[in-house]
Amino acid sequence: MFNYEELFQTHKTPFYLYDFDKIKQAFLNYKEAFKGRKSLICYALKANSNLSILSLLAHLESGADCVSIGEIQRALKAGIKPYRIVFSGVGKSAFEIEQALKLNILFLNVESFMELKTIETIAQSLGIKARISIRINPNIDAKTHPYISTGLKENKFGVGEKEALEMFLWAKKSAFLEPVSVHFHIGSQLLDLEPIIEASQKVAKIAKSLIALGIDLRFFDVGGGIGVSYENEETIKLYDYAQGILNALQGLDLTIICEPGRSIVAESGELITQVLYEKKAQNKRFVIVDAGMNDFLRPSLYHAKHAIRVITPSKGREISPCDVVGPVCESSDTFLKDAHLPELEPGDKIAIEKVGAYGSSMASQYNSRPKLLELALEDHKIRVIRKREALEDLWRLEEEGLKGV
């Protein structure tokens, strides 16, 4: 059993704590699922881009799915090889495209005809041939939260089949473009395998048509999105996931790329926070803690529910419903409504569970609150992987502006 009391003697709350053994095992589970088939697991940095986490994955020969030049540079700094990096996203700037091409990453996932022509122009100016993939929007309902659904025609992501064909033919004729992959990604936190298989089958059929037209495809990028169990939901079995994709690709000798993020890191992380006060207002019980929505946004943004565990011994205390809330001046600064917790006292510690994905990566300094300390548990030892910001860090980049006042 992990000794939290020793941890609290050294580190003040709130902080993130990650179990690196869980991250390692989650990644290896993907490698095992695709064992025996040409594949590349590109971890999606958007889920959590801490350098120490990336370094751990780099040592396991992970690739990287990046959506900004900042993420690409993070991946490289952590030791992920350029030939294992793919660059996705609907709004790549010309600067980002140029930098990615200079770094010679594996390929860019292209999301519009205008972007394709921009890449071509930049590649021509550099005197190189840009490896590209085209993201196809298969118009399939991923059955997930609308904010993280990306595979329907009303979503901003990818292009339809007809436009994709036109883009591939354009790229084939270009002296500065090299089409090497097809790509789709239908959403995040997916708990139903059927939409993924349906999308794989649909895009595999397109890939066969492209190959028949003389386009030399080498990769089949299925995106990511496998969900985790936040509320005891049944999740997708990775063996079934891999077999479904492999079956869709029968007759195609392509390297499979998948881009998991949440399912690699979510279950590894806890947000450790302490009780500041308890209050009752009009028969409503509130537990006020020292972490806020700026530290962990998912409950406020997505109405996501994360289990809360009391760390401080509380045997014998009366249990009753309460809302666990933070100090930020928003009514949405709520971690969990109607949580059944024992009576809590100032200084008691609680853990918000499964926050390793889209926790620290979505954090902000809202209300001028410094970003949190991040710790790793590895080989039964604790180490700091991100220092807590100091108050002075909040305005450090603004001080120059005061000189002219």
Swiss-Prot record:
GO biological process: lysine biosynthetic process via diaminopimelate
InterPro entries: Ala_racemase/Decarboxylase_C, DAP_deCOOHase_LysA, De-COase2_C, De-COase2_N, De-COase2_pyr-phos_BS, Orn/DAP/Arg_de-COase, PLP-binding_barrel
Cofactor(s) recorded in Swiss-Prot or TrEMBL: pyridoxal 5'-phosphate
Effect of mutating residue 148 to A: Nearly no change in substrate affinity and 47-fold decrease in catalytic activity
Name this protein carries in UniProt: Diaminopimelate decarboxylase
Effect of mutating residue 148 to F: 4-fold increase in substrate affinity and 23-fold decrease in catalytic activity
Function: Specifically catalyzes the decarboxylation of meso-diaminopimelate (meso-DAP) to L-lysine.
Annotated positions binding substrate: 262, 298, 302, 330, 358
Protein EC: 4.1.1.20
Swiss-Prot/TrEMBL keywords: Amino-acid biosynthesis, Decarboxylase, Lyase, Lysine biosynthesis, Pyridoxal phosphate
Molecular function GO terms recorded: diaminopimelate decarboxylase activity; pyridoxal phosphate binding
Catalytic residues of the enzyme: 329 (proton donor)
HAMAP family documented for this protein: LysA
Modified sites of kind N6-(pyridoxal phosphate)lysine: 46
Keyword Lyase in record: yes
Pfam families: Orn_Arg_deC_N (PF02784), Orn_DAP_Arg_deC (PF00278)
